[in-house]
Structures are given as C-alpha cells and as structure tokens.
C-alpha cells in the first residue's frame, strides 16, 4: 500500500499564506497541476492494480482517465455529498466530472447511492462513517477531560444547520467545527470553531 496525500499537499500550500489563497482563488496557482504531475509519476513508479481516492478534489478527470486507461481499477470514497457542495472544502468540478470514471463508489448516504446508480450507472456500495485510531492516540484521548456536549465536524448546509439548531432549541449544547458556520446559525447553545484536521479531530 502506498499513500499519496494529495489533500494534505494542497492544504500545505493553501494555508501557508494569504497570498497562496488569493492566487488559488484567482486561478493563478499551479498547485493542482503539480499535484497531478506527481500523482502520475507515483502511479507510474509503483504500477498499482487499484487506486482508492478519498473525495478527489485535487485529482483531475484527465489524470484519473490516464490511470484507468492503464487498466487500474479506480475506487472513490466521499464522506460528503458529491452533488451538493456546502463549502469550499466539500467538493468541486473534479468530483462531479470524474464520477463515471470510477469502477466503484463508496458513499455513506442512501439517496446519494441511488442517484449514483440511477443517473450515472456506476457501481455503488454503502459505507457508513467509521474511525480507526492508533492505540497511542486512543490512550492520549482517554486522559482528556470528557466534554458533555454534542460535537459536529463538517461544513454547513441548510439541512445540517436546521438539524443542529433543532437540537440546540431543546437545550442540547453543541460544538461545531467547520467553515462559514457563522453564516448559517446563531444560538446560545452552539459554539462555533474553525475546521480541525487529522489527530486534532479527537
């Protein structure tokens, strides 16, 4: 197994400076081109039989088609909805344009599974959310003081905001982590934080 951390490569660039963010938003950055070139070099060097893509925002349809034409099976797991983008981190055109290139999609959502099968005619399996952390990290987490609140990690959309506000209305305290939640909810029982990644999620 060889890991190719495309998303982390992008984050390292994007969050390094405000200039990088501006360059990317103005479509003047070459970071995605660099990531895709490195992806092709990596695939060429290890010649895998399968590639599992997490979400796929950084990989272009052209790069995926190149891999597919080499006989490599492409599998996608997207923890967000590939048809509804609730924020800049939840999806982009690379995801929607690449849907039919994959040999298999894993999704957490029954409606998404149905749409992938019926509209795009692609093989799809349901894979609920799950986490597997190291014993070392588990032991660190055990030593932390327990916080008796609901915790939600992810970017907002109207449905998520409505559900979270409904919980807050009945007296449940909630910590929310993600981008732009201030534009969706405002409640005394809800505390909003910036996104967290990797081990910081725990």
Model-derived features with residue positions:
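Nucleotide-sugar donor-binding catalytic core of glycosyltransferases
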Residues: 1-21, 30-38, 55, 61, ...
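Glycine-/proline-rich flexible loop or hinge segments
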Residues: 20-25, 46-50
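Glycine-rich phosphate-binding "P-loop"
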Residues: 22-28, 74, 80, 126
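Short N-terminal targeting/anchoring amphipathic segment
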Residues: 40-58
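Helix C-cap/helix->beta junction micro-motif
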Residues: 46, 70-71
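Structural motif
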Residues: 49-52, 73, 104
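Histidine-anchored nucleotide/phosphate-binding helix
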Residues: 63-68
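A short, histidine- and acid-enriched strand-loop-helix "catalytic/donor-clamping" loop
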Residues: 76-88
